[in-house]
Amino acid sequence: MDLFPPKFSKVLVTPDPQYIPGYAGYCPQLKYHVGQTYGQLTAKLLTSPEVSHSQRLVLQTSPLSSTEKETASRSQIWWSRHGASRNLETMIPGYTGFVPLRQNYICKTYAETCRDALSEFNQGQAKRLHNASADLSFPVINSVPDFRPRRSNSPLIALSKDPAPYKAPDPWKPPGSPYFMEDSSPHKYFISGFTGYVPKARFLFGTGYPTITNKALIQFSKEMKAGPASLQKYSLQEEDSSNLPLIPTIYPSKTGLLPSYTGHIPGYRFQYGHTFGKLTHNALGHTASQKNAGAIRLS
């Protein structure tokens, strides 16, 4: 009876030699045997004297002496440059930073791959600096006997302890809202993407948005300057053909607003179940209950 139990169970763990599942290499007479697991079957075939084996091993253990020496020297190079506080053995997978030359190393743990890659990179950097320094020829600065280094100039003397602040002769001023600009102002327009309400803009199309809003605002300003009394007597024949049809009010009392109107409509957010035109019918003349009753009558 054994004094100490084995570390691994011979029933649960197949003893060596064996191939682990997923091995894509050749195993003699594997395709002629069935009924066992891959590990048990390969262990039986590799140890059975009845199976003819190759006189030369296909797989063999690589030497470790040179690898251990290279690993030790590379670790010393890394610690001499970055200090012993940077322990590469604790580096875990998932690091998203750049590790130079890491793509050249495979079949190792992540920490070993990073350590070898960084050590090789440091060796290459040191070799490159050594070769570059050997090609440089440093000039002798004090080759002239009477050479005196030039002294730096002292800072300028301040003319005043409390200098006056600088004021631009033509300071920039914000142009203001396009609604209140003069008709001749080149900034009287809205840029593309503006979602606010632009009066008279719904009758214009075929040009860019800044051009449309400029014409609409100019026409709206003319109507506002003319006054409400003269709006009814305003004649379209007296103006050029670019003038727009008159709309004395923004919210008509007899009809609803057109779809895609982006301005504010009192009480519209609390209504639903009808079209946009029915819900905006006489937006300023009724309460919410009166609007709903009117929408029902229209339907």
From Swiss-Prot:
Q: List the disulfide bonds.
A: none
One family name in Pfam for this protein = CMI2B-like
InterPro entries tied to this protein? CMI2A-C-like_dom
Q: Does the keyword Cytoplasm apply?
A: yes
**Is DNA-binding given among the entry's keywords?**
no
Cell location: Cytoplasm, Cytoskeleton, Cilium axoneme
**What is the protein's major site of localization?**
cytoplasm
- GO cellular-component term (any): axonemal microtubule
Expression across tissues is: Expressed in airway epithelial cells.
Q: Which UniProt keywords apply?
A: Cell projection, Cytoplasm, Cytoskeleton
Family under the similarity heading: Belongs to the CIMIP2 family.
Q: What does the record give as the function of this protein? A: Microtubule inner protein (MIP) part of the dynein-decorated doublet microtubules (DMTs) in cilia axoneme, which is required for motile cilia beating.
* Listed PANTHER family: CAT EYE SYNDROME CRITICAL REGION PROTEIN 6, PROTEIN FAM166B
Q: What is this protein called?
A: Ciliary microtubule inner protein 2B
Give the organism the record lists.
Danio rerio (Zebrafish)
